[in-house]
UniProtKB/Swiss-Prot annotation:
Highest rank taxon of the organism: Bacteria
Alphabetical list of PANTHER family matching this protein: PHOSPHOGLUCOMUTASE (ALPHA-D-GLUCOSE-1,6-BISPHOSPHATE-DEPENDENT), PHOSPHOHEXOSE MUTASE
GO-annotated cellular components: cytosol
Cofactor: Mg(2+)
Signal peptide span: none
Name of the protein in question: Phosphoglucosamine mutase
EC number(s) recorded for this UniProt protein: 5.4.2.10
GO BP terms in the entry: carbohydrate metabolic process; peptidoglycan biosynthetic process; UDP-N-acetylglucosamine biosynthetic process
Length: 445
């Protein structure tokens, strides 16, 4: 059981200006992290950020804290989260820090860490950082203070890494692709990767101004992408979230292709190429259609708790190399160490190019069950709505009605005061009615 006070499932996150996302807290966080990480012998930390205006302020605070602890900061500028993981490994830095709130609005921000090998920090290290934060800040001797510098052509390094995950014998020259970068960290990366691999690229969501990240664009809102794909008669569309660790796709008919379908395509192609090792890891939210489709292919499937760190833990536990969330986090351990939207998207494009098949046709072997998700906001500290007898009773009624051909899942968000109500089954109208019935019970608590 974790005793972490500040760190959630994806680092520390909140509204800018409210605790804990304040300059003084982040400065002390940088100092505490520096004290803990310096014990391991390294004196440099990679710092990247997305395109939020608050990133400048938080970047400066982190730098000051790290310097006081005697560690130097290497800045990447706006850079996707998986790029920071990659650069942390290649620079042999003690850790990487990403300033981002991922898919959240611009007024939120957060801090998350990568270890020296490009994976999320273990709980024990996060707990050690929190323990250090209880102490008074002390500064190292002046001669031992950390410095700050910028990495030359960090974007170019990451672009070449992404391209190297795409087979040399294939090309994207026959594809017209609309790419939506959510006005986020991939805006100067993804279009260039696709163009350099030969694609005809139409870019949207590539004009960040500090306050428009994820605003009606990107992986969490694909309506603009769907409209543009149809208007341009493109072969497909690819959307990333604000920090580039999620990918959602759209086929030539405007149909959304989520993380479950993306993992199905990649796993099936890996099986065909004789490169799939073991099975695939999804989450409690993964569609039943994915589980059934993989079963038909003879590919083992396991569910982890929701959250990419838990998907990775389950992958490591089983020794498997592919895992995903339906939200678009896709982890391919044969390619990289964390969820990477661009790399995952490239593997789907490789399957299209190799088999001369459309994205729509690649998805045809998997029948998606209707899955309705309703988010219900609750007041933190007012008790657990999921433990209320009325909520349990309604959930039990719905589960009984669905039987073996459906599922009910209620869970708390790891980053916001939300209860997520998910109901899945074969009849969309019935599933929708059931989901709202449970959501109403949660609201009434």
């Amino acid at each position: 059981m974790s005793n972490r006070k500040y760190f959630g499932t994806d680092g520390i996150r909140g509204r800018v200006g409210d605790a804990p996302i304040t300059p003084d807290f982040v400065l002390k966080l940088g100092w505490a992290a520096g004290k803990v990480l310096a014990r391991h012998g390294s004196r440099k930390i990679i710092i990247g950020k997305d395109t939020r205006i608050s990133g400048y302020m938080l970047e400066s605070a982190l730098e000051a804290g790290l310097a006081a602890a005697g560690l130097s900061a290497l800045f990447t500028g706006p850079m996707p989260t998986p790029a920071v993981a990659y650069l942390t490994r290649t620079f042999r830095a003690e850790a990487g820090i990403v300033i981002s709130a991922s898919h959240n609005p611009f007024y939120d921000n957060g801090i998350k860490f990568f270890s020296i090998d490009g994976t999320k920090l273990p709980d024990a290290v996060e707990e050690a950082i929190e323990a250090e934060m209880e102490k008074e800040i002390s500064c190292v001797y002046s001669a031992e203070l950390g410095k700050a510098s910028r990495i030359v052509d960090a974007a170019g390094r990451y672009i070449e890494f992404c391209k190297a995950t795409f087979p040399n014998e294939l090309s994207l020259s026959e594809l017209k692709i609309v790419v939506d970068c959510a006005n986020g960290a991939t805006y100067h990366i993804a279009p260039n990767v696709l163009r350099e691999l030969g694609a005809n690229v139409i870019a949207i969501g590539c004009e960040p101004n500090g306050v428009n990240i994820n605003a009606e664009v990107g992986a969490t809102d694909v309506r603009a992408l769907q409209a543009r794909v149809l208007a341009e008669k493109a072969d497909l569309g690819i959307a990333f979230d604000g920090d580039g660790d999620r990918v959602i796709m759209v086929d030539h008919e405007g149909n959304k292709v989520d993380g479950d379908q993306i993992m199905y395509i990649i796993a099936r192609e890996g099986l065909r190429q004789g490169q799939l090792r073991g099975g695939a890891v999804g989450t409690l939210m993964s569609n039943m259609g994915l589980e059934l489709a993989l079963k038909q292919l003879g590919i083992p499937f396991a569910r982890a708790k929701v959250g990419d760190r838990y998907v990775l833990e389950k992958m490591q536990e089983k020794g498997w190399r592919i895992g995903a969330e339906n939200s678009g986090h896709v982890i391919l351990l044969d390619k990289t160490t964390t969820g990477d939207g661009i790399v995952a998207g490239l593997q789907v494009l490789a399957a299209m190019a190799r088999n001369h098949m459309s994205l729509h046709d690649l998805c045809s072997g998997m029948k998606m069950f209707p899955q309705i998700l309703v988010n219900v906001r609750y007041t933190a500290g007012s008790g657990d709505p999921l433990e209320h007898e009325s909520v349990k009773a309604v959930s039990a009624e719905v589960e009984a009605a669905l039987g073996s051909r459906g599922r009910v899942l209620l869970r708390k968000s790891g980053t916001e005061p939300l209860i997520r109500v998910m109901v899945e089954g074969e009849d969309e109208a019935q599933v929708t009615e059931f989901a709202h019935r449970i959501a109403d019970a949660v609201k009434a608590v």
